[in-house]
């Protein structure tokens, strides 16, 4: 049988999603917890591999198992065996045509900046700190130049292994909530470091060093060296993954924390 899960995790303690030798990963911890409940080796596939320090509130995974368990048993049993900074949000049995990565039609991220002269003490690993005042409205205006299907070479990590830099950016919104600035971005898929590289360039606009139109120029230039620095990992969250409606997967608040879904 094939099971799909949605999980959330605080990525600050992990060297990313993917299992790696001699370091702790989210995948490793999840597979260990699943093996306790299944009483057999388990390998999971995820919708999007997050880097070291990146968080998730809506990561979707699937796994195959010969063990027959009721869905509440998977939910409670796996959560009981996970570290406190990883939790299962929902569980659903799916047929073998479902794949967490390849069935997905879009991914959605949020990047959270604590915009204050002083660094935060609480939630310090859950946000990125930027001390200069940022203009969220200008950042939002700049982000609109990236919408649609485009070549994102200027916002792609040098070592990105994707076969093509073309992605369809569906939604990008920048809003301010007191001292917090939230960059909400959705695309069919993302090249490596795309959200963090876009964020780094939007910060340049927000601090008044560049005009919003500069982002359009960057996109057309197709040169990573011209764009802003890669933003830190701490403020980034994978919050949602879209699938065709026929899969009827559960929906939960996107978060993180108090942030509204829209």
From Swiss-Prot:
The lineage of its organism: Bacteria, Pseudomonadati, Pseudomonadota, Gammaproteobacteria, Vibrionales. InterPro entries: PsdUridine_synth_cat_dom_sf, PsdUridine_synth_TruA, PsdUridine_synth_TruA_a/b_dom, PsdUridine_synth_TruA_C, TruA/RsuA/RluB/E/F_N. Formation of pseudouridine at positions 38, 39 and 40 in the anticodon stem and loop of transfer RNAs. This is tRNA pseudouridine synthase A. Gene3D superfamilies: Pseudouridine synthase I, catalytic domain, C-terminal subdomain (3.30.70.660), Pseudouridine synthase I, catalytic domain, N-terminal subdomain (3.30.70.580). Substrate binds at residue 109. GO terms for biological process: tRNA pseudouridine synthesis. GO terms for molecular function: RNA binding; tRNA pseudouridine(38-40) synthase activity. It comes from Aliivibrio salmonicida (strain LFI1238) (Vibrio salmonicida (strain LFI1238)). NCBIfam families: hisT_truA. It is an enzyme of class 5 (isomerase). PANTHER family: PSEUDOURIDYLATE SYNTHASE (PTHR11142), TRNA PSEUDOURIDINE SYNTHASE-LIKE 1 (PTHR11142:SF0). Belongs to the tRNA pseudouridine synthase TruA family. Homodimer. HAMAP family: TruA. It catalyses: uridine(38/39/40) in tRNA = pseudouridine(38/39/40) in tRNA. Keywords: Isomerase, tRNA processing. Its EC number is 5.4.99.12. It comes from the Bacteria. The keyword Isomerase applies. The active site is at residue 51.
């Amino acid at each position: 049988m094939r099971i799909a899960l949605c999980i959330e995790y605080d990525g600050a303690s992990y060297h990313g999603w993917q299992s790696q030798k001699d370091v702790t990963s989210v995948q490793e911890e999840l597979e260990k917890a699943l093996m306790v409940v299944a009483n057999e080796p388990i390998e999971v596939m995820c919708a999007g591999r997050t880097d070291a320090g990146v968080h998730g509130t809506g990561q979707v995974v699937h796994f195959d198992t010969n063990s027959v368990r009721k869905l509440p048993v998977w939910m409670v049993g796996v959560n009981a065996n996970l570290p406190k900074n990883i939790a299962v949000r929902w569980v659903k049995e799916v047929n073998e045509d479902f794949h967490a990565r390849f069935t997905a039609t879009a991914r959605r991220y949020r990047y959270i900046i604590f915009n204050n002269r002083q660094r935060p003490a609480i939630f310090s690993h859950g946000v990125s700190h930027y001390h200069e005042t940022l203009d969220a409205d200008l950042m939002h205006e700049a982000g609109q130049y990236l919408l649609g299907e485009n070549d994102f070479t200027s916002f792609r990590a040098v070592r990105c292994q994707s076969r093509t830099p073309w992605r369809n950016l569906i939604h990008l919104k920048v809003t301010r909530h007191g001292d917090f600035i939230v960059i909400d971005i959705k695309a069919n898929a993302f090249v490596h470091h795309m959200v963090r590289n876009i964020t780094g360039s939007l910060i340049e606009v927000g601090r008044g060093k560049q005009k919003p139109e500069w982002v359009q120029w960057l996109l057309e230039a197709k040169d990573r060296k011209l764009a802003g620095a890669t933003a830190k990992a701490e403020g980034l969250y994978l919050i949602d993954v879209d699938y065709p409606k026929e899969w009827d997967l559960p929906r939960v608040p996107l978060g993180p924390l108090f942030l509204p879904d829209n």
